Each structure stands twice: as C-alpha cells, then as structure tokens.
Design a protein with these regions (language model features):
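Amide-donor transfer/coupling interface in amidating biosynthetic enzymes
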Residues: 24, 75, 81, 120-228
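Catalytic nucleophile loop
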Residues: 79-103
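Short catalytic helix/loop segments, enriched in acidic residues and glycine
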Residues: 14-27
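Ligand/cofactor pocket segment of small-molecule handling proteins
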Residues: 94-137
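Flexible gly/pro-rich beta->alpha loop and the following alpha-helix that scaffold active-site loops
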Residues: 27-87
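Short glycine-rich anion-binding loops that position phosphate/pyrophosphate groups of nucleotides
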Residues: 4-6, 57-60, 92
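Short, flexible/disordered intra-domain loops and linkers
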Residues: 6-15
Length: 228
C-alpha cells in the first residue's frame, strides 16, 4: 500500500517506497508475488491479498484535506475487522494507530532523522533471531502518542516511546524504515540541508555511523506474515 505522495525531483531519483519494500522482501522470499497499489492516488486493492505492507509518506495522518486519507483509514479498519495481516511502516504505523482509535501528534523535539534505535521490551515469536535493540532509518516529525485500545507496545526509545505496536496477531507496526537504504537517507539529508536547522542535520549525519539492521528486520517481516 503505497502512501508516499512525494513528487519532488529528489524522490524521482529513487525507486518509490512500494518498490523499496518489494525489493526488501523479495530477496528473502523470491517465490512470493507482490503488487504495489498507489493508495495515495485513491486506488485501493481490487482483490484480496494474503498480507499487506503500508509504506511511509511525508503526508500527515491528521491531514483530513487529503482526499485519500479517510478512505485509507476506513480500509485499515476493514483489514483489522477481517484480521488480515498488515505491517505498517512510519506513516503506516501512525495511520494504523489513527484508524483504530489512537492518537498521532507532532513531536515537540522536532525531527527524528538518520538512524534510530528501538529497544525491544517484548519479543514476539516471529522476531527470530531475537535482538534486544535494532537500528533503522528514521524520517518523521510526528509519532504515535496514544495506542489504540488493545494494542501492545513492543519497543521504543526515549525519543519515540511507542516505536512499535502489535494488535492481536495480525497487525505489526514500526515508526521506522527497514526498506530505506543508507544512500537514500544521505540524499534525503542533502535535499533537506536548506530546510532544517543545522543541529538537527548534524545529529542525523552523525547517526549514520550506526549501521541499520535491515536484513534482520526484513527477516522478521516475512516471518510475521508466515506466522499469521
């Protein structure tokens, strides 16, 4: 479920977010079949799938003026009611929270950019091999501030306390970006160099000294779907 509506020249230099997710998962399960559905254009799946991944987006889940936002939140509620397997990434994490009764707000400390940790307080069965802390790319200035009723926080950090949620056995979300390569983040920071303050950019660049746990997180994602 591609929700990224960025049409800037910068974004066009890279595969879209849906393609990034496909590349991540197809390396691990080459026999799986994938479709990228541009829900940001108001297009929703015309058929049922075994599982869904919702991408990140520069859009805000609180922006009711976007014509595709309300239908997307309704679609999330439908998937939840049908107990369809769903993974939400960044915006997807926030959209799941918003759709199911949680709250999302702008972070008073500003942007989370670069690499960011999730300290896992709960290890689900499909999170194997287990790891106490994972690091992934971050690009957000909003975050989940209240989870939906029944959701469980699996992990987080001081900057982002609700970094990952699980709802029943069929929904898993993360505030972060397992599909985002380091080269994309480096280019994104360059693109934002005249749009953000120097301290935020310096922290983001410095954080890239930490490697991202992309292979491990991708493995957890496919194992989540297989466990559903």
């Amino acid at each position: 479920l591609r929700t990224n509506d960025d049409t800037s020249a910068f974004a066009k230099d890279f595969p879209n977010d849906g393609q990034k997710v496909v590349e991540l998962l197809q390396r691990l399960r080459p026999h799986w079949q994938f479709d990228v559905v541009p829900v940001k254009d108001g297009v929703f799946p015309a058929q049922a799938y075994d599982g869904y991944v919702m991408t990140g987006s520069p859009a805000s889940v609180n922006d009711a003026s976007l014509p595709w936002m309300a239908p997307l939140l309704d679609f999330i509620r439908q998937l939840d009611a049908e107990q369809k397997p769903l993974i939400g990434l960044c915006f997807g994490h926030q959209a799941v929270a918003k759709a199911l009764g949680g709250e999302v707000a702008r972070h008073s400390a500003g942007w989370g950019l670069g690499t960011a940790p999730t300290h896992w307080t709960t290890t689900a069965d499909w999170m194997q091999p287990s790891q106490a802390t994972t690091t992934l790319m971050a690009a957000h200035n909003e975050q989940v501030t209240r989870m939906p009723e029944g959701a469980v926080c699996l992990g987080g950090s001081d900057f982002c306390p609700i970094g990952s949620m699980q709802i029943s056995q069929h929904i898993w979300t993360t505030q972060f970006h397992p599909e985002m390569p380091r080269v994309f983040m480096q280019a994104l920071l360059g693109y934002l160099s005249d749009k953000l303050d120097a301290d935020t950019l310096a922290r983001a660049h410095a954080s890239l000294a930490n490697s991202a746990d992309v292979p491990l997180f991708g493995q957890w994602m496919v194992q989540f779907f297989e466990a559903c």
